[in-house]
């Protein structure tokens, strides 16, 4: 009955000709307090009465306008009422309705509850649909109207209102929310827009047609509002891309290509780098790496990385690209830019003794990254440029085979060797020995290993040699020749596996697990007895003590009395396990004067004379023993190591002795360097062909590591890019100082930088350096370093612009990278080897149970007004800590998730604090960077950990009070997220 009474009141006012303010006073007398006019549908009732005749009733319309101005009725009910009027033939009524819309559509607001704000979004979308239908009606009417001028005026009125509504970013944002809230209604809008698009094509007026097309274009842009980002300022270089490529090529050649592809794609997206410039930077980094890599194994690894792994990674990146054909064009463009860097390419060609670019072009063509025509054109251009390039004058260059060509030929050879190794070893051990002997010649082994590492086959390669090593443990009745072959197969496989473990990491050797089976001998020996990778071995550990004392004594007697090791029926794995205990006995005898130096020389010659693996096992124990001795007690141990590492000269050695000694010397050099680097003792091995480890002993002696870190970062910043040697320095410093020390000190260096250009450069370089262990460094940065800066008022001055803005950018980049990769794949080899003792237990710092809040969460949640959490997540009250991640049931077991949740709570408290300053400005930059780095769609990004209550605080910050930012920082896939966004938008 209320509706009837309302109509009666309106009719009485019209009959008695009440003025608008008299009408308002009397209406409030007629109806009790507590009943809102929207519930009574006052706006709809007034419009119904005003639009009864062919022309609108001006008096009743004045009542409606007064109700709008005095906020008796909400904008949403007025728009809903207007959208229900569908008699477009009544021109005067339509004109009046459009004038009413003019009163408020340019500044829509709602200060009620979130549901009322959502209602305004729905009403605005309904009004948009109504305007589209109205414009379509007048467009169609123009075909038959007798007075085209009047018809065009009516259409122009509709289009002007459409443009007025759609021209406001805020209004489009509200419609965007309504689209997600009511997809069926948005479908109706799209259909109306389609009908208008079809109608306007026949419009005679160019001006009206352009006006209508502009409105249609604005409507089409609404679904993609979040995908529009500000343009990235173009720079001359992208140090992050360079450093990420350098890091991968220097320290993670064996890693799977997919994580590299995802990381490169993340960097490209976050920094808004055009694809052709991104590809150019990748190739530049590869060529610089080729030029600066140390000769030997590292050079081969870089060559394999550049010519095998990177083309394959870019082929995977192409599959991620939305338009693959454009990718090929961008690749062509990147090579065109690269060809302009003639001095760089000439230096690479001089180093590699070949045309590097032509080989890269051929590889890209094989993988479908370049067309045949483009490849030929680019090769012709480079050939012409090379005519002017300096040539090496050395006469031996014509005989040097270029490493890139060797690597490319080695790649199919790896596959063939794997097939050969699959055969039954017992049928033709001599043939297999011939294959292995060929692998040992020259640098064939390192070429094959580098090619296998770059193509992801190294682990399979190593497994084959472990199987071969295990095969030699099975002894039958054997002749002297068979015993020689078996000894050689054991020795070569053992040495190769040691070399692989030292060059590419022990994870290449380790199997996934041996359930129900015995661990292979070499795996067991490597894990317990082999020095390296930061392991400090105890020479008295049981692994160095053979349980069968009789066998040890027999071995000591054999070494001391015999002129050479016997081979037949010898169980080489048992000899390897017995050697440490035997060496201890021999060493003690020498120390006590029982054995002479000549006897020791004879014993060491026996050990290394036939099977070099025995010398490796002996030195493994000796270097562990040396660490336990004082400086004045080491002479005899070091002398034994030198004797074991020196090659023998004579004919009484087994086949491939010189090749095996070269590998043995390299293994011993590496083994001793890693273990003795802290004892200021160096042992040089003079075997022909052995090369010093290129990255050992590179930290300056007697210099505090903090100064080393500061110097390394300063020089890198001035140079603008990070080289491979410096990357190894940073990795060593991270290992020595720990994650917190490393992160905290680098952030301090960043905050000291007051030059804008250098601060932004520092961010790119630090992001790449943090890739050494992104997950752990991000946890430290977000969980320790940032909270310390934001909660300590004495440190707030450090967050001023530009260093504060730079730190915000670094934090967001690290957070987004870590969050996007935390559930993908395994950590890289260098991360698995890192010690974790210095990382605080995040499970206790941020408890798993939501009811068991951390100290920080209790502090920040102490002012909550609503404590009850309802069963339905969508119906939960908006307390200060509820976030989208909780509604999505994101796992709180992940340390990064807990750190992000607590960081956003801290940010929320900074925004809500009474004191504003640099810390507030930092939060603003942090949120701006989150929005800038947001992926299309935004679902699953770090912003889901932001409390919903924080949105209303953010819009109070002037630079964050934009509709696009509100849409970006809220999870619009959730009903609660849409309500929060609508409430924030309508308050702008």
UniProtKB/Swiss-Prot annotation:
Pfam families tied to this protein: Med24_N
Keyword terms: Activator, Nucleus, Repeat, Transcription, Transcription regulation
Chain location of the short sequence motif LXXLL motif 4 per the record: 555-559
GO CC term, one of those recorded: mediator complex
GO biological process: positive regulation of transcription initiation by RNA polymerase II
InterPro entries, per the entry: Mediator_Med24 (IPR021429)
Motif, LXXLL motif 3: chain positions: 445-449
Transcription is among the record's keywords: yes
Motif (LXXLL motif 5): 786-790
Motif position, LXXLL motif 1: 128-132
Family classification: Belongs to the Mediator complex subunit 24 family.
Gene from which the chain derives: med24
Motif LXXLL motif 2 location, chain numbering: 341-345
Motif LXXLL motif 6: where in chain: 856-860
Disulfide-bond pairs as recorded: none
Function summary: Component of the Mediator complex, a coactivator involved in the regulated transcription of nearly all RNA polymerase II-dependent genes. Mediator functions as a bridge to convey information from gene-specific regulatory proteins to the basal RNA polymerase II transcription machinery. Mediator is recruited to promoters by direct interactions with regulatory proteins and serves as a scaffold for the assembly of a functional preinitiation complex with RNA polymerase II and the general transcription factors.
Description of how the protein assembles with itself and partners: Component of the Mediator complex.
Localization (cell): Nucleus
Protein name in UniProt: Mediator of RNA polymerase II transcription subunit 24
GO MF terms held by the record: transcription coregulator activity
């Amino acid at each position: 009955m209320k509706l009837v009474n309302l109509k009666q009141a309106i009719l009485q006012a019209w009959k008695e000709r009440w003025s608008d303010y008299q009408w308002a006073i009397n209406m409030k007398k007629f109806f009790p307090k507590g009943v809102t006019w929207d519930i009574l549908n006052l706006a709809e009732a007034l419009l119904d009465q005003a639009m009864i005749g062919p022309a609108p009733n001006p008096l009743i319309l004045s009542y409606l306008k007064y109700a709008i101005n005095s906020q008796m009725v909400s904008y949403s009910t007025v728009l809903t009422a207007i959208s229900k009027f569908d008699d477009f033939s009544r021109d005067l009524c339509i004109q009046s309705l459009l004038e009413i819309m003019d009163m408020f559509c340019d500044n829509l607001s709602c200060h009620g509850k979130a549901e009322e704000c959502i209602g305004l979004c729905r009403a605005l979308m309904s009004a948009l649909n109504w305007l589209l239908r109205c414009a379509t009606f007048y467009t169609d009417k123009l075909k038959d109207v007798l007075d085209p001028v009047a018809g065009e005026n009516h259409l122009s009125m509709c289009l002007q209102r459409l443009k007025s509504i759609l021209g406001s970013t805020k209004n489009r944002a509200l419609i965007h929310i309504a689209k997600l809230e009511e997809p069926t209604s948005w479908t109706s809008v799209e259909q109306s827009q389609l009908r208008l698009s079809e109608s306007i094509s026949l419009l005679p007026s160019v001006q009206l047609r352009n006006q209508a097309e502009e409105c249609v274009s604005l409507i089409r842009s609404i679904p993609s509002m979040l995908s529009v980002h500000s343009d990235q300022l173009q720079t001359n270089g992208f140090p992050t891309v360079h450093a990420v490529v350098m890091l991968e090529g220097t320290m993670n050649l064996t890693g799977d290509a997919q994580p590299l592809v995802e990381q490169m794609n993340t960097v490209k997206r976050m920094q808004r780098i055009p694809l052709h410039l991104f590809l150019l930077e990748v190739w530049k980094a590869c060529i610089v790496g080729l030029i600066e890599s140390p000769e030997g194994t590292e050079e081969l690894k870089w060559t394999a990385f550049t010519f095998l792994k990177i083309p394959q990674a870019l082929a995977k990146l192409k599959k991620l690209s939305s338009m693959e054909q454009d990718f090929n064009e961008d690749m062509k463009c990147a090579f065109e830019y690269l060809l302009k860097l003639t001095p760089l390419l000439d230096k690479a060609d001089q180093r590699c003794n070949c045309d590097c670019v032509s080989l890269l072009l051929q590889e890209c063509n094989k993988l479908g990254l370049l067309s045949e025509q483009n490849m030929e054109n680019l090769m012709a251009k480079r050939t012409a440029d090379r005519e002017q390039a300096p040539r090496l004058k050395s006469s031996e260059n014509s005989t040097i085979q270029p490493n890139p060509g060797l690597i490319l030929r080695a790649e199919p050879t790896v596959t063939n060797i794997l097939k050969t190794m699959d055969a039954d070893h017992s049928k033709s051990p001599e043939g297999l020995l011939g294959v292995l002997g060929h692998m040992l010649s020259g640098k064939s082994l390192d070429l094959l290993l580098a090619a296998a590492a770059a193509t992801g086959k190294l682990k399979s390669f190593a497994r084959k040699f472990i199987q071969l090593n295990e095969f030699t443990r099975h002894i039958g009745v054997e002749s002297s020749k068979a015993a020689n072959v078996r000894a050689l197969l054991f020795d070569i496989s053992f040495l190769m596996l040691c070399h692989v473990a030292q060059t590419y990491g022990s994870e290449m050797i380790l199997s996934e697990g041996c359930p129900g089976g015995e661990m292979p001998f070499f795996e067991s020996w490597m894990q317990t007895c082999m020095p390296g990778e930061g392991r400090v071995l105890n020479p008295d550990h049981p692994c160095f003590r053979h349980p069968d004392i009789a066998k040890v004594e027999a071995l000591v007697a054999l070494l001391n009395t015999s002129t050479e090791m016997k081979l037949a029926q010898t169980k080489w794995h048992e000899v390897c396990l017995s050697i440490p205990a035997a060496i201890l006995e021999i060493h003690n005898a020498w120390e006590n004067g029982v054995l002479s130096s000549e006897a020791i020389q004879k014993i060491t010659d026996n050990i290394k004379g036939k099977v070099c693996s025995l010398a490796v096992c002996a030195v493994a124990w000796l270097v562990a023993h040396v660490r336990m001795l004082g400086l004045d007690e080491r002479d005899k141990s070091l002398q034994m190591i030198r004797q074991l590492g020196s090659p023998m000269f004579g004919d009484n050695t087994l086949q491939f002795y010189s090749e095996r000694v070269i590998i043995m010397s390299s293994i011993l050099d590496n083994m001793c360097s890693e273990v003795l680097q802290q004892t200021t003792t160096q042992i040089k091995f003079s075997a022909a062909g052995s090369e010093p480890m290129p990255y050992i002993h590179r930290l300056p002696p007697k210099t505090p590591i903090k100064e080393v870190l500061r110097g390394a970062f300063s020089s890198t910043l001035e140079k603008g890019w990070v080289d491979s040697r410096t990357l190894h320095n940073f990795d060593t410093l991270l290992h020595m100082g720990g994650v917190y020390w490393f992160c905290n000190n680098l952030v301090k260096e960043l905050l000291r930088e007051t030059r804008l250009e250098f601060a932004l450069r520092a961010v790119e370089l630090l992001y790449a350096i943090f890739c050494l262990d992104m997950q752990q460094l991000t946890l430290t940065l977000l969980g320790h370093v940032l909270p310390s800066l934001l909660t300590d008022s004495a440190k707030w001055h450090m967050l001023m612009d530009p260093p504060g803005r730079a730190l915000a950018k670094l934090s967001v980049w690290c957070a987004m990278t870590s969050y996007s990769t935390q559930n993908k794949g395994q950590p890289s080899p260098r991360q698995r080897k890192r010690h974790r003792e210095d990382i605080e237990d995040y499970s206790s710092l941020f408890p798993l149970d939501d009811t068991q809040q951390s100290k920080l969460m209790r502090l920040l949640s102490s002012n909550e007004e609503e404590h009850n959490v309802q069963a339905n997540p969508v119906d939960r009250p908006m307390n200060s800590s509820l976030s989208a991640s909780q509604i999505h049931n994101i796992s709180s077991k992940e340390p990064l998730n807990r750190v992000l949740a607590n960081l956003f709570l801290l940010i929320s408290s900074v925004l809500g604090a009474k004191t504003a300053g640099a810390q507030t400005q930092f939060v603003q930059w942090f949120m701006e960077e989150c929005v800038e780095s947001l992926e299309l769609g935004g679902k699953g990004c770090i912003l889901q950990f932001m409390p919903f209550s924080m949105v209303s605080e953010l819009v109070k910050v002037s630079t964050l009070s934009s509709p696009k930012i509100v849409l970006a920082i809220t999870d619009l896939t959730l009903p609660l997220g849409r309500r929060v966004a609508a409430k924030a938008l309508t308050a702008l």
